[in-house]
UniProtKB/Swiss-Prot annotation:
One BP annotation, GO: tRNA nucleoside ribose methylation
PANTHER family with a match to the protein in the record: TRNA (CYTIDINE_URIDINE-2'-O-)-METHYLTRANSFERASE TRMJ, TRNA/RRNA METHYLTRANSFERASE
Its biological purpose: Catalyzes the formation of 2'O-methylated cytidine (Cm32) or 2'O-methylated uridine (Um32) at position 32 in tRNA.
Protein name: tRNA (cytidine/uridine-2'-O-)-methyltransferase TrmJ
Location in the cell: Cytoplasm
GO annotations of cellular component type: cytosol
The keyword Amino-acid biosynthesis is assigned to this record: no
Subunit structure: Homodimer.
UniProt xrefs under CDD domains: SpoU-like_TrmJ
Pfam families the record matches: SpoU_methylase
Family statement drawn from the similarity comment of this UniProt entry: Belongs to the class IV-like SAM-binding methyltransferase superfamily. RNA methyltransferase TrmH family.
Name of the encoding gene: trmJ
Species assigned in the record: Cronobacter sakazakii (strain ATCC BAA-894) (Enterobacter sakazakii)
Length: 245
């Protein structure tokens, strides 16, 4: 089940950080590392700092875009160290661990970490169902990339160990089929297309409304069947408009 949890690093600029992250992951039983458009490729320094976790580096998936790293996932959590102009559903690391383990039993989960200096962009954070923030000392809250991964990975492991001891899963948690990220992105594209065709949003300025709608649906988190209903509603609107003389 832990193999279903992806640790995703976006545009990492130092190979030593890749190695340190691999070490942090493996100590907690995580091995599924994804590198999105790394500014440098893993090298001997990454292997050296992995300190016995070189297999995690060697088996890492290297992709060009975040969308590729999130493909097939039903849950995406993005790390964020600061509040944004558009509030988003938040988790603390413990909640992140519990939710990740719960959902990884039936579909891949991605926990996304941003660039060393600037983190994730707003557009990248909007691809996430939740954001997670580590409650560090406000007077000195600087965590390097591997430290942040270690904190989250520890909470994932604690949640996984607790799930092994539990006699039965929480009611309904494993039975809820949530849509994959790919399906959600297709829905958002379909929604924007319909709203443009009806004149509800302007072609030159769709962003603000679409961002707020993303936030609304992220907060509501529709199940797969509910998303199918929404897609059907959009298709019905398109059909009705096409039938008009």
């Amino acid at each position: 089940m832990l193999q279903n949890i992806r640790i995703v690093l976006v545009e990492t600029s130092h190979t030593g950080n890749m190695g340190s992250v691999a070490r942090a992951m493996k100590t907690m039983g995580l091995t599924n590392l994804w590198l999105v458009n790394p500014l440098v490729k893993p090298d001997s320094q990454a292997i050296a700092l992995a300190a016995g976790a070189s297999d995690v580096i060697g088996n890492a998936s290297i992709v060009d875009t975040l969308d590729e790293a999130l493909a097939g996932c039903s849950l995406v959590v993005g790390t964020s160290a600061r509040s944004r102009t558009l509030p988003w559903p938040m988790l603390d690391p413990r909640e992140c661990g519990l939710k990740s383990v719960s959902e990884a039993t039936h579909a891949p989960v991605a926990i996304v970490f941003g660039r060393e200096r600037v983190g994730l962009t707003n557009d990248e954070l909007q691809k996430c169902h939740y954001h997670v923030a580590i409650a560090a000392n406000p007077e000195y809250s600087s965590l390097n990339l591997a430290m942040a991964v270690q904190v989250i990975a520890y909470e994932v492991r604690m949640a996984w160990l607790a799930s092994q001891d539990a006699q039965t899963p929480a009611p309904g948690e494993e039975e809820t089929p949530y849509p994959l990220v790919d399906d959600l992105e297709r829905f958002y594209g379909h929604l924007e297309q319909v709203l443009l065709s009806t004149g509800f949003i302007r072609p030159n300025h769709p962003g603000q409304v679409m961002n707020k709608l993303r936030r609304l649906f992220t907060r509501a988190r529709p199940e797969s069947q509910e998303l199918n209903i929404l897609r059907g509603m959009l298709a019905s609107i398109e059909s009705s408009r096409n039938e008009k003389p």
